[in-house]
Amino acid sequence: MTDQLITLIWIIIKIVLILVPLLVAVAFITLAERKVIGYMQSRVGPNRVGFRGLAQPIADIFKLLLKEVIIPTASSRYLYLIAPILSLVPALAAWAVIPFAQGWMLANVNAGLLFLFAMTSLGVYGILVAGWASNSKYAFFGALRSAAQVVSYEIPMGFALVGVLLAAGTMNLQGIVLRQSGGLWHWFWLPLLPLFVTYWITAVAETNRAPFDVAEGESEIVAGFHVEYAGVTFALFFLAEYANMVLVSAIATVIFLGGWLSPFQGIPGLESLFAWVPGIVWFVLKLSLFIFTYFWMRATFPRYRYDQIMRLCWKVLIPVTLVWIIILALAIEFHWTHWL
């Protein structure tokens, strides 16, 4: 009994050690986004709260927590309140299998890749429930758009993950990272470049971020599925969006950029020079690169029309991933794998 209690306490400690830094990071990612986009648009960004605006996320948190939660009269009360939780929980649960460094993970699951794909697909249910329960036509339109978009883009994303599975020969995320040992040119981003690009486009679409944010098109459907939400409930949707953004960036880091592995492996001189850098530092740096591309895309691209988004998925991404999977399967079958 004592051993079971110690194991349970240790698991809880590990969960806290994962979730607390994640939630703090999400808060400051919102500030980083506003600052980066501000500089891209020749603005300063938030600079009033604290030194150079560094306390802005804290002010935003208090503002959201102190606002009243107003439940629409004709809404389905319980579904309305459950919807934000349905969006947030999968985004947090998926972190259980993400390896931050060698052995640094909550659960070393052999079907980790499958678990991640399942978790990233569940968030849409919260959006659907929110659109239905709000009893608002704008919220419902936004929810339907989001459902169609996420279900469509799950197909090319799934094909991209199948390509990684073929190349690595395992669904264990730690095994996938170790399969990429050897340096920058051994990571899967290069031999699986079309799948890498496809994964990243689908990741942006799955998280409903610009330029794929038609689910909350302010100019068309007044913020979409969370138009009737305020205060804490809106904050949970906001948190879920950014937690998903960090999650898909972490997945891309693990399956395409070698996770915690140093980019200087196999390079004489540089490998020993940077040998002191912990693996988790490389992991965070790679993840930050993907987060930056989210900001860059939001500042650069206009929102696509709904038909353009669907056409990109069904007529471009799905055929590209299918062709590359066939090429990869043939290469493995005939042992032309020197490029992997």
From Swiss-Prot:
One of its GO terms (biological process) is aerobic respiration. InterPro entries: NADH_UbQ_OxRdtase_su1/FPO (IPR001694), NADH_UbQ_OxRdtase_su1_CS (IPR018086). It is found in: Cell inner membrane. One of its GO terms (molecular function) is quinone binding. It comes from the Bacteria. It catalyses: a quinone + NADH + 5 H(+)(in) = a quinol + NAD(+) + 4 H(+)(out). Its EC number is 7.1.1.-. Keywords: Cell inner membrane, Cell membrane, Membrane, NAD, Quinone, Translocase, Transmembrane, Transmembrane helix, Ubiquinone. It is an enzyme of class 7 (translocase). The chain crosses the membrane at residues 9-29, 81-101, 113-133, 158-178, 184-204, 221-240, 245-264, 273-293, 316-336. GO terms for cellular component: plasma membrane. It is a multi-pass membrane protein. Signal peptide: none annotated. Belongs to the complex I subunit 1 family. HAMAP family: NDH1_NuoH. NDH-1 shuttles electrons from NADH, via FMN and iron-sulfur (Fe-S) centers, to quinones in the respiratory chain. The immediate electron acceptor for the enzyme in this species is believed to be ubiquinone. Couples the redox reaction to proton translocation (for every two electrons transferred, four hydrogen ions are translocated across the cytoplasmic membrane), and thus conserves the redox energy in a proton gradient. This subunit may bind ubiquinone. NDH-1 is composed of 14 different subunits. Subunits NuoA, H, J, K, L, M, N constitute the membrane sector of the complex. This is NADH-quinone oxidoreductase subunit H. It comes from Coxiella burnetii (strain CbuG_Q212).
